[in-house]
């Protein structure tokens, strides 16, 4: 029996599925900052040290929690996802599009490619809908506290995860397998079967057809907010 074709939906998260940056709902207020104050600290630190912006915000999270006596554990960050506010229609979108795909004889899969935090996304009400969540993530020491960036997902770095989905090499530790040559007919999901939904600058490399060959409409409209 022939296998069903697979259609993959790839989503940014902040300001695409939820209404603002995911740290803004609970994490930043717990430090006693407004979002503007926290991001100003993180961005200034990054500029002053010529640091990747995402690594700068992750470092700032660790340092500010240390100063305020907050245990930056995995469980704490997951709990910060409980307050995420999704855009109207997002929660039931997955069931609706899955049913539509089934009616057409295709299998639908959902993936996140986000510059936010995997742990916070896992605490949201829709995390169970995704086959894989690719987002920034911390490594935790023997005391259970965030001590080092485990994964950083930004800009052109996001495109590697499109290729992982294309080849079916989802484990981020399997770089050798990802970079090995693979015939097109062996790739699990063709680029032409992917739909990317994003809102910001960090999404541009993924939707640039020269980079990933994902489908795009000639009539599409792009909007570029101030942050990704």
Q: What function would you assign to each model-found segment?
A:
Residues 2-142:
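Alpha-helical substrate-recognition element adjacent to the catalytic core
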Residues 18-20, 205, 221:
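Conserved protein kinase catalytic core
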Residues 81, 85-111, 115-213, 217:
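C-terminal cap/substrate-recognition subdomain and adjoining C-terminal extension
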Residues 214-228:
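Positively charged, low-complexity/disordered segments
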